[in-house]
Design a protein with these regions (language model features):
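Glycine/small-residue-rich loop that forms an oxyanion/phosphate-binding "nest" at active or ligand-binding sites
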Residues: 1-7
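Catalytic cores of large soluble enzymes that bind and process phosphate-bearing ligands
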Residues: 3, 71, 166
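Conserved acidic, metal-coordinating active-site core of Asp-based
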Residues: 8-10, 14-131, 138
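Mg2+-dependent phosphoryl-transfer enzymes with acidic/Ser/Thr/Gly-rich catalytic loops
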Residues: 102-186
Length: 186
């Protein structure tokens, strides 16, 4: 599932109204849609290919994997509260970092990706452990047989997790979870 040009147009209209930047991603290329607000996305992912573009020059024939809004945390958080409610029904909208808001097609998130993977591998959902710390991990933490939140996870992730690690992801919490719940003999 991907975004059409019309989806990107709707998100661009919304982000312009909220004075936020919007980048549209298609097959590994980030189209930085020019606006009054500078996108910070290149600072998060400098290895990606960035192409500055006016909205009018985006191809209506292309499809887009997702859109992102990378902006200073405080104004981003304030703007999120003002996003049109119907957009939350039409799209997946979540923060994946303090300064990064992601926009995805409805039902495109980590849980659906894991479900497709285990179906292909013939693994039962109850055998899946998922680890995470940000709002974009919420769906897979809820979905997994064992949802593991890092100590530094956002409160929403900790609230739905089966386990909260005693350390952060920077302190090898994922390795701890694997040792504790996968490798340790019962």
């Amino acid at each position: 599932t991907v975004f059409s040009y019309d989806d990107v147009a709707r998100l661009y209209e919304e982000t312009e109204k909220l004075s936020l930047p919007l980048d549209a991603i298609s097959e590994g290329t980030v189209y930085q849609i020019q606006s009054d607000q500078e996108s910070l996305y290149a600072k998060f992912n400098p290895a990606l290919t960035f192409v500055p573009v006016d909205f009018e020059d985006l191809s209506s024939q292309m499809t887009y994997n997702k859109c992102v809004t990378a902006f200073a945390q405080e104004p981003l958080d304030a703007a999120i509260q003002k996003i049109s409610p119907e957009l939350f029904d039409q799209y997946e909208i979540f923060k994946s970092r303090e300064m990064l808001l992601e926009w995805s097609p409805k039902n495109v998130h980590k849980a659906t990706g894991l479900a497709k993977l285990i179906s292909h591998l013939g693994i039962d959902q109850s055998q899946v452990m998922a680890c995470g710390d940000e709002a974009n991990d919420l769906s897979m933490i809820e979905w997994a047989g064992l949802g593991v939140a890092m100590q530094n996870a956002v409160p929403e992730v900790k609230a739905v997790a089966n386990v909260v690690t005693p350390m952060t992801n920077d302190e090898e919490a994922v390795a701890w979870a694997i040792e504790e719940y996968v490798l340790k003999e019962n």
